Amino acid sequence: MSNVLGMYARSVKENFVKGNGSYLYTDKGEKYLDFVQGIAVNALGHNHEHLVKTMKTQSEKPWHISNLFLIQEQEKFAKRLCELTKFDFVGFQNSGAEATELAIKAAVKYYYSIGKPDKNRIVCINSSFHGRTIATISAGNNPKHIEGFPNLPNFDHFDFGNHEQFKEKITNKTCAILIEPILGEGGVKVIPDQCLKGLRELCDEKNILLICDEIQCGYYRSGKFFAYQYA
């Protein structure tokens, strides 16, 4: 019996022992093309020579010195990301769920800090996926994820493609709109470029923040560094 807590229904019995590029190999020598990519988080493939060399080099340096101190590699990475995205700052997190949590907290805290504490509601798409914390499952509003858990009250939802329903959810208490430019677990639905442009214009007009969750579709998975860049 496995000592790993049974959080996932593992119906696949293959035991992968080696990876190379986009391929995985089992202990029986079988070769598989990896379309799963660790649930869309391993966009760089397996065992890339450059990455292996980089990790070996870093393993001989301090492993963790806390964000209270200057970390040169972190500074370099942040600068590169800002060059690619044209943003000014990067906040590093341990996971996609934590990144979405940070975005949710930042949106609410921003309006609180400028004297608008009641502007604290976030509009999201039904059955989207933003993580498995209490806040992120409330944002996603997927019945199979929120069953048995308290649904946080600060989220308003609309069905994908229902523009009228979306407009009804925008109020003077809306602080942000949280979307996946390409819904993953919601059915691989792509928000059209014109709709993304319209969202940006609406947010500018209404003084609302726009949050794009690209944990599963960013890093060139769609062709560009981020999917929102098509708009």
Regions found by a protein language model. Give the residues of each.
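Conserved N-terminal phosphate-binding loop of PLP-dependent enzymes in the Aspartate aminotransferase
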Residues: M1-A231
